[in-house]
Amino acid sequence: MQASIESTGNLERRLTFTLPQERLETHVGGRLRELARTTRIKGFRPGKVPTKVIEQRFGQQVRAEAMEGLLRETFDSAVREHSLRLAGNPRIDQGETDFDFVATFEVVPDFGDIDVTTLSVVRATAEVTDADIDQMIENLRLQRRIWNPVERGAQAGDLVALETWSQAGDERLPADGVETGSSVLGSGVMFDQIEKGLEGLTKGEEKTLSVDFPAEWRVPQLAGKTVQVHVKAVEVSEPVLPAVDKEFIKSFGVKSGDAEQFRADIRTNLERELKGALMNRLRREVGEQLIAAYAHVEMPPRLVENEARSMLAQQVEQVRRSGRDPGQVPADAHQGFMDAAAKRVLVGLLVGEVARRNELRLESRRVSDTLRLIASTYEEPEQVIEMYRNDPQLMNGLQSRVMKEQVIDWIAERAQHTEQSLSFQDAIRV
């Protein structure tokens, strides 16, 4: 195989290689003969279709498939021959002839000696207590609450239906009429000064509040200004929570309505949530330590840019899913994600290097356990497991996640670490 490599940048390489034409022709010929034996074409007996007919009908497709397979195989072989470790996917262009190709790609930087024993990691620990279960049951009751109108003044926990309009200098918002909405006092949904101003209001009562909006406020006409906000309490309602009886318990999938089973199910769910939260904390902690230790290492520019664009796309999609219009996204919007992307790429490449150098292998048992854990959050766990097993893309994503968790654990076990005991609520807080 003819192949040559040249450096076109600190981390960019250009690989020029030639496909072995005789291998391509051999593969194409063999595939066409196989099709001649197995293909049924009207007017010809099975296995007696002339080669010329087979070539006219399938030749172009067979050649394209063979070329694609041989291209991938030849490139991979050249990469192994030159001991290259790619960072991201290559761009492969046609060379001077149909069999010449030029691949441009970035390589993994040299991290030198990766000594994880010098890292200092804080490993958080926590457990689910009866008080956490009680709090979750209270949260479930709040989800099922109903509202009863009251004549007294609004207080914390009440739902206040509102009509509002604002005066910012010479500008009235809205220009005509009022805006309607509602807020539960103490929920923090509304601006703090407005929410505090609603306390004590009775049905039909009006009030004008002087509100100082911060410069970064989401409404440009109000940002950085002292605004007169006129509010009217259309209605004040207090919450009525359901009793924790059999019917309430059954509504959450516990068919027996048994209180102890209900608490056991809640504990299982909270422990699953806690396990994920502690892993995320550990992953973040290890990542921060790796970034601090290897921030001096140059990252592949194109890989970082691609990661930044991916992060931007995820944010735009989140905005769209929330029902908001992301608007026109500037061509250079990804620049705001470049620092975060560089850190993410650094951690990803380092984790891969640690796995490679220490010959860490994916644990199939851990993959199965993680899959069962994911499936247990759905009503039909077995269907979810089957869906993953029949979808290579889903399984690849799961395996990548598990492999990263394995490496993070491996690093944390060998790093200098101290334990930090947290409450359940603190542990799951982002």
UniProtKB/Swiss-Prot annotation:
Which UniProt keyword terms apply here?
Answer: Cell cycle, Cell division, Chaperone, Cytoplasm, Isomerase, Rotamase
Q: Name one GO molecular function term.
A: peptidyl-prolyl cis-trans isomerase activity
Q: Which residues form the PPIase FKBP-type domain?
A: 157-242
SUPFAM superfamilies per record = FKBP-like, Triger factor/SurA peptide-binding domain-like, Trigger factor ribosome-binding domain
List the GO biological process terms. Answer: 'de novo' cotranslational protein folding; cell division; chaperone-mediated protein folding; protein transport; protein unfolding
Which reaction is catalysed here?
[protein]-peptidylproline (omega=180) = [protein]-peptidylproline (omega=0)
Q: Which InterPro entries match?
A: PPIase_dom_sf, Trig_fac, Trigger_fac_C, Trigger_fac_C_sf, Trigger_fac_ribosome-bd_bac, Trigger_fac_ribosome-bd_sf, Trigger_fact/SurA_dom_sf
Principal location class: cytoplasm
Please tell me which top-level EC class this enzyme sits in.
isomerase
| E.C. numbers | 5.2.1.8
Task: Name the protein family.
Answer: Belongs to the FKBP-type PPIase family. Tig subfamily.
Q: In its UniProt entry, what is this protein called?
A: Trigger factor
Which source organism? Answer: Xanthomonas oryzae pv. oryzae (strain MAFF 311018)
